[in-house]
Amino acid sequence: MQEQIEGAVDEELLKQSVLNNDEDDRRLTKLRIERFRTTHTLYIFLYSALAALQFIAIAFFTRGFLLSRKVLDDVANRDESTAPAKFDRLVLLVVDALRFDFVIPVDVAAEGYNSHYHNHLRALYERWDESILLKFLADPPTTTLQRLKGLTTGSLPTFIDAGSNFNGDVIDEDNIIKQMCLNNKTIYFAGDDTWDALFHPYLSNVSMPYESLNVWDLDTVDNGVISFFEDHLLNNPTEKKEWDVLVGHMLGIDHVGHKYGPSHFSMAEKQSQVDGFIRQIIDAVDEDTLLVVMGDHGMDHTGNHGGDSPAELESTLWLYTKRPGTWRRQAPAAYNTTELGRYYRAVNQIDLVPSLSLLLGLPIPFNNLGWPIEELAHDDDEWRLFTRQTLMQLETYRNTSNSITDSSKLKILEELKINANSNSSDAGNYQAILLEMYKDLWARFDYYSIGTGIILLIISLAMLITITRLIPSIVVGQMLSELVPTIIVMPLVSNVCFLGVFYVLRQPAFLQNWLWASLLATAVGIIIGFYVPIFDRYNLTWLVLRFGEELSDYWSRVAAFLITLHALIFTSNSFTIWEDKIVSFSLTTLGMLTLYEFVFLPKRHSTSAILAAALGEKEGTVSGISSGQANSDSLPLGRFARIVGGYHSIVLIVCTRLASLITICREEQGAYCTPTFTLTNNYSFSVMLGCLFLVFATPACIKGYYNVSSSYQAAAPIWIGMLMKSILFVNFIYWELKTFENTSDTHGLNLTIFNLTISRIVVGVSLVAANIGWMMGPLCIKLNVHNNDRRSQQATILGYANAYGAQYFLLVINFFMCILLFNKPLAQLSLFLMCNQLLSILEIFDLLKLKENLIGPVALGLLSYQQFFSTGHQATIPAVQWDMGFILTERITFPFTHLGIVLNTFGPHILCGISVALLTLWKQPPGILRANTLLARVVSNCGMLLIYQTVLCLSTFIWVTNFRRHLMVWKIFCPRFMFAALSLIVTQLVLTFITIAFASGRLIKQIDRMFWK
């Protein structure tokens, strides 16, 4: 025992001697650590200010571009012109995502027939003599909240309303539900809680709203609606009914689409349930009750919606009454069900509002722009009555809004109005032209806000270029004590000046209120506070010349070309829809260029390394690197290094190509794209077998990279060999249970509690426990003592050559494990490939001595976008995987639901944002660079990744503005600009608060303390 204690003491003494534990060094170390801590804090403030500036720029642009129409508060009143009611009561059943081909008969031999969703909802087509079945065309965006607004107001919600699908407020403008309430009708409701959010003041207290956004729950809402109808309609005699309007909104079909896609046996089961329920309602209603069954939108082949493809826009409208002679049909050819109802008669959703108002004897809501459905008038006299009342409402709205001021347009409307009054068959032309005019009017933009946003983003880009490429990183570190205080003070000064001037004089109209004025003042203050110290040291001419010098390097020019190529994609809708292929091609091209560099140009000297050598010889104390080290970096690569580099280039190329095979297609890509990211493929046996393979392959691959630098020591085996393998196995069990749910009939077996428990364990361990362990745990190094003779003992530190990088990558592993859970099986295969791509990129740029070159961050930027597409995403609203928000919870719970969607959508961006520090830290031994120099280089690489993201965001801003009148602006360009803005925001937050604030500073300080140099 005594010998063991003495041996431990001797080893500790040896460690102290190896690490040069001198009292003077300790004192100097403390001072340097304090200086480092101050510098680190100042960097956090600097990048937080840059983030604030860019967020303000995005806010101004978004406010100016995403339209919001002017809503009139007027409410229509009943008068003598109001048509008499044809029905006393209304039963309204909304079946979410009731696509039109779901309800019509489809021949089993017809092209497009699918046994999972065709011919199960027959009730709507069988009662042909007593009902009217129509194709119901929605207006994009096809999200539930926006469709309900259109279905009840008769107006058109704008694109920005799609963002509020999670947060509906009571509709202020006139709507048919409000009119029912004002005309003393009692409204009972059960189903989607969006109704309660929009119409709460008008609904009866007995109403039963249910949470709507938990897309994994197929039955709760539907069963609740059925139970509610049983209590108040099906099992209740007509004379005892206390309601005038009974509304139900079922979600099962929509949720099956989101969870499984339409081609799943659950869709047939859910449609059969709805069919039986409708038949019960038909039997229960009397002649004085109108039954309306309708969908709010359709769904695409993946089961999603939100866009404007025909499958998403074509829904169903069915009106039924037991009273004979109520409807007047058009010619039979108008109701052609062949080719999945392609040529079937269609009406717009906004036409429902005037139609129901006329049938129920209600005033048509004031803001309505719809037109009555012709089949609802049983003769010409009634049709003339309907058209006259609707024309009066439309004319009143036009005169009150006073929006159309163009004399030529007014003349056209007056002529159409005269024709409509004399001939009711021409009345529809007036409404159609008026609707198109208002659509054009509502497409008005706030150019002051748009311009402000673009200018602020351009300036933020210039600021990033200044501190990352034009001024040496070590000099920026020295200037922080001047930059940060002025950046903090100047926004306060500018706020006082702006608000004071606006208060005394007049605030510009586009600022609207003091909040926007304050945001603009803050942005101006940050800009002034940044550039005052810069121009105190440097003049503009010198900075411009430095910019030209930065592009003189071969790899910098390659990086600039790749950034420019990506930014120019958004100049065309054709390029934008194929961005996934272009990005994959760009990353493959980069791999080919590095392979060419290693194989065919072995004597090429790294330009950046030569520059570092020159700086080292001339200004060794400023550059932070010894001249010997710099000169060694500039030497040509040896044969073994070229072989290794060629191998990693091939790995990058192959993994990129394999990942690009996993894709989800945009509608616009048509027959030129075959989707592989499908429900069937995701839960296939081969893919799940691949996920099981990943449990062992991923740790093995990472271990191989660690063994190259002898870094598989101490913490590494615990993290990679034990923790990671265990978490990946638990993750596999989770998705195996999901596969069982998706592909098998569980016979009532509820696996929810198991799934929630597993997911919470994975997130808790990977995101919380593992990161705490990383903060407090050992490094990936081991002290090897040679020769037992105490007088001649020697020691080797295994893992010393990659002490920074190996330890930092453990943090990347933590986030990788967490993000993996929130991605479907095929996406997990892609993320495994990403892990190899990432490590190969680090090895390549270490061998090429390009740790400070722009090409490194650009490569990671390309990787993040390439993996975004190969994990089942596109820059479209329907491609958002909303179901990933319910991995941690059964219902919407902030922040866990939102966290799941963010980690799923932006997982590759988060991983690349954290990993950008590894461009500096990978294969970086302690003692070569000072702590402040190392931190400065990490921050500089973070800034370069932000440059890449900012350029893309700026490009989308400019081109979406340029194409604001383009036919595809809301379908292609606008979603892409929104995604670019969100990508920049996520990257900013990750770089500022994780990479710089949490990870890099902590690790550099920890290693600097340990080695005391």
Curated annotation (Swiss-Prot):
Localization annotation: Endoplasmic reticulum membrane
Membrane topology reported for the UniProt record: Multi-pass membrane protein
Keyword Hydrolase: no
Source organism, top-level taxon: Eukaryota
MF-aspect GO terms: mannose-ethanolamine phosphotransferase activity
Keywords: Cell wall biogenesis/degradation, Endoplasmic reticulum, Glycoprotein, GPI-anchor biosynthesis, Membrane, Transferase, Transmembrane, Transmembrane helix
Disulfide bonds: none
EC number per UniProt: 2.-.-.-
Glycosylation-annotated residues: N184, N205, N336, N399, N423, N539, N707, N742, N750, N755
Transmembrane segment boundaries: 41-61, 447-467, 484-504, 515-535, 558-578, 582-602, 643-663, 682-702, 715-735, 761-781, 802-822, 825-845, 868-888, 899-919, 943-963, 977-997
Pathway: Glycolipid biosynthesis; glycosylphosphatidylinositol-anchor biosynthesis
CDD domains in the record: GPI_EPT_3
GO cellular component: endoplasmic reticulum membrane
GO biological process: cell wall organization; GPI anchor biosynthetic process
Statement: the UniProt record of this protein carries the keyword Transmembrane helix: yes
Function field: Involved in glycosylphosphatidylinositol-anchor biosynthesis. Transfers ethanolamine phosphate to the GPI third mannose which links the GPI-anchor to the C-terminus of the proteins by an amide bond. Involved in cell wall biosynthesis.
Family label: Belongs to the PIGG/PIGN/PIGO family. PIGO subfamily.
Name of the protein: GPI ethanolamine phosphate transferase 3
Species of the source: Eremothecium gossypii (strain ATCC 10895 / CBS 109.51 / FGSC 9923 / NRRL Y-1056) (Yeast)
Source lineage: Eukaryota, Fungi, Dikarya, Ascomycota, Saccharomycotina
Gene symbol of the encoding locus: GPI13
